[in-house]
Amino acid sequence: MANLKGGTFEKQLKDAFHRLEAFGVGRVGKNDNLTHSDKLAEKREMYLKDVTNYFKSENLTDKLNILFTKENLDKFFSQRLENLSSKTQENYLRGFSSMLQGLEQKNIYIPLHFEDKSFFDDRVKIIKDEADTIIENRYINNAKEVIKNLYEIREISGLIAQTQYELSIRQAEAFELVRNPLKYLDNGFVSDLVGKGNHKYEQKEISFELEQKLLNNQSSLIDKSTYYNDLQKFSISSHDFRFTSARDKFEEKIKNGITEKEAKLQISRELNHKREAITDYYLKRTK
């Protein structure tokens, strides 16, 4: 199997786009994943630009198709699909999957297809399961006890959950911190952690206990679906830790005499936002 042609992402993107083109080619009796319409061409151009921009933001430099690994795409989709409706997420995943199948049909090497053939089906299943569950209150009662129980089920799941809860961060950001602790940890602080929209978090203090756990972790990182399944044992989702953390830290600040307005602004910055309204949203979902 071959790689995409071109010495830059832009040239490889164009090569991928042209390989998929099949305008005017009849589909009767065929079952391919090529581009037969202008509408599909527009979507695939968007997919390719989205993932190319993500790879650039991560300073990845290999051939575009070689970067289509399970690890890279898992991180890309976690960032790209966040806060989209379940139907939009599902359509995006199905469209992207079809595009990769089309490239493989044109003899382009796609690592993901050798690593995990059910990658897209598993992700869509998770989205559908979550969509079927209407979550009003995102607060986790006894969050620390839940985290303790997660450690007993699978140590790495407990570590990811504790990292999310103590630092008020998203699942994708916790995965990155667990994966590369030396890149971000510096004498009791987390620095340069990048969140949604490529925005860096303000420097965060981290407990000595959690810092040592991250630095000394020997467990292999799991994928999102495994973490999801572990959390399902407690009927919670990964983002619930961020909601719960925001509520707990807000109440702690109020107890310490900080005004409500200032506490909300501080929590918003903890969440990597800059608006009081963001904290209001988190508090409304954790009553």
Predicted regions and their residues:
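Catalytic-site neighborhood detector that most strongly recognizes the C-terminal catalytic loop/helix
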Residues: 269-287
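C-terminal catalytic core of Y-nucleophile DNA break-rejoin enzymes
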Residues: 195-238
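Flexible interdomain linker/hinge and immediately adjacent N-terminus
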Residues: 108-145, 194-196
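Short basic/aromatic active-site micro-motif
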Residues: 231-255, 260-269, 273
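Short, charged phosphate-coordinating catalytic segments
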Residues: 162-187
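N-terminal DNA-binding module of tyrosine recombinases/phage integrases
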Residues: 1-38
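N-terminal core-binding DNA-recognition domain of tyrosine recombinases/integrases
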Residues: 23-124
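Basic, Lys/Arg- and aromatic-enriched nucleic-acid-binding interface segment
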Residues: 140-169
